[in-house]
């Protein structure tokens, strides 16, 4: 007698342990799942709604300064250490893990204009209104010892900014001119001057480390090579640039924060026009910093908000504000790509999540898989009207909201004026300037 028996391999359905999930047999043939797209759309819509529900970006506020925060510096070796300088000459070293100040130094008489940490993390430099550059030890002095700077350099003019080389014992200061200093010398190795106006900010390139850039009060951005005795290139804009930042992943790309409410991303090889114009702020942009991945940047503005922009996008993906936060003067992105720190006029440093709805802490494998799945669904359906509307919706203060409406009216009026001028002029006599090129006045080699 012949008996036919169904034979199954136990490895296909038996769990190894009791804690494992039950294996569910699935057939991925599209013909068997005609409503797959509609189910995915519903899941993407729910994921987008939940993202906005759980968007609580504010983490903590570090208070202790007795005057407005003027500058912030990150520690290159420690994620939990941040330094800040205030308008009363005070420098504080913060422990972000404990959310408390670990050390306070009265560094200068007047404003602390600039702050940078040495590449090894053992010391830091400050410049102030008292015409001095001071180097301080990162470690606290022993019991009974007086807090004194390791070195003090007395300058001839006021210093307005400072930045340290990524891997050499060299730093740059700016004021009436840009000076390149060796840490062991009391006189600058090189000095660069182009024009008579003062320079407000200087930054080293973290990739091409011999290149640095500065921005001045004469509306210019100047590029330098510290191996050459003269500046490389100068670009003059319509309005003044307040701060600069180099992309940490792309050697030739930098972004400038401008007084005309915009940020301009340039390729230093082609300075005739910016690569991208980042709009959305309604007041002067005071500071800018890149994420460690080089894919996003954060800006601080006089309109009491900070915004996060994707590098390839002209509009922000996120805007952060609070009722108490006043004009934001400085901003930094943490080295682990998780947090954003900003300092403002009302003497506080605030810590924000880089991704507003991100869950902090350790994720289980199932949580991580669900997050990745939801993220892919949101990317797949991001251009659908309903999902796009929910994802873009943000609550704004009334002042910012009314200024946005006012600027839209002004922009439309300028557009109509240009159209009418072109309509009543000889064909071709009135050119159509692009948004990128119309703010660049001249490039000087």
From Swiss-Prot:
Keyword Cell wall biogenesis/degradation: no
Pfam families in UniProt: Sof1, WD40
Region (Required for nucleolar location): 353-441
UniProt feature, compositional bias: Basic residues: 413-426, 436-445
N-terminal signal peptide: none
UniProt keyword rRNA processing present: yes
Record-linked InterPro entries: Sof1, WD40/YVTN_repeat-like_dom_sf, WD40_repeat_CS, WD40_repeat_dom_sf, WD40_rpt, WD_repeat_DCAF13/WDSOF1
Principal subcellular localisation of the protein: nucleus
Highest taxon of the lineage: Eukaryota
Pathway(s) where this gene product acts: Protein modification; protein ubiquitination
Region (Disordered) location: 413-445
GO MF annotations in UniProt: ubiquitin-like ligase-substrate adaptor activity
GO aspect biological process, one term: oocyte growth
GO cellular component assignments: Cul4-RING E3 ubiquitin ligase complex; nucleolus; small-subunit processome
Intervals holding WD repeats: 64-104, 107-146, 152-191, 194-234, 236-276, 280-319, 323-362
Keywords: Nucleus, Repeat, Ribonucleoprotein, Ribosome biogenesis, rRNA processing, Ubl conjugation pathway, WD repeat
Subcellular locations according to the entry: Nucleus, Nucleolus
Subunit structure: Part of the small subunit (SSU) processome, composed of more than 70 proteins and the RNA chaperone small nucleolar RNA (snoRNA) U3. Component of the DCX(DCAF13) E3 ubiquitin ligase complex, at least composed of CUL4 (CUL4A or CUL4B), DDB1, DCAF13 and RBX1.
Role summary: Part of the small subunit (SSU) processome, first precursor of the small eukaryotic ribosomal subunit. During the assembly of the SSU processome in the nucleolus, many ribosome biogenesis factors, an RNA chaperone and ribosomal proteins associate with the nascent pre-rRNA and work in concert to generate RNA folding, modifications, rearrangements and cleavage as well as targeted degradation of pre-ribosomal RNA by the RNA exosome. Substrate-recognition component of a DCX (DDB1-CUL4-X-box) E3 ubiquitin-protein ligase complex.
Family, similarity comment: Belongs to the WD repeat DCAF13/WDSOF1 family.
Official protein name in the record: DDB1- and CUL4-associated factor 13
Species, as recorded: Xenopus laevis (African clawed frog)
